[in-house]
Amino acid sequence: LQQMAYIKTGRILHYLFSTINTVDDVDASLAKLEMEGLLADSDITAAKLKTMLDKRFQNRQVADWFSGKWTLFNECTILDYDPHDDSVKEHRPDRVMKNGDEVVIVDFKFGSPKPEYVEQVRRYMALTRSMGYSNVSGYLWFVYSNRIEQIS
């Protein structure tokens, strides 16, 4: 039962982060969650989420990602042709940010680290480079622990 609550909270947070462009959007995004009824049958409240977000934004790197200095692409789809099976695959990084020639890719995670997460971000980075961007960095952000892993 606790595991289910943990997963549900992770889904709520994932959705919440997709609606936050800058730190200034937090209150409106939390209000939207409440209006949409996403917190109605949950133990988590907007106040608890706000406290958690405030703590996460104290991390300098996270604060930078939500600073407003970036052109933001939330949940954007990157298409990839696979010649092996003649199919088009869709990839959807959680947050792609661009500032000048710099591109930063962040994937939010709410569980324990897994090797496939690293490969997932590496794939996003390779696809972004194939679009002509050379200055690309990628990160996994484990939101619950507020741990950031840079992917090389």
Regions found by a protein language model. Give the residues of each.
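Metal-dependent nuclease catalytic regions and adjoining charged, substrate-binding loops involved
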Residues: 126-152
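Nuclease catalytic cores
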Residues: 1-93, 97-100, 116-119, 137, ...
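Short, surface-exposed beta-strand-loop junctions and turns on beta-sheet-rich folds
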Residues: 111-113
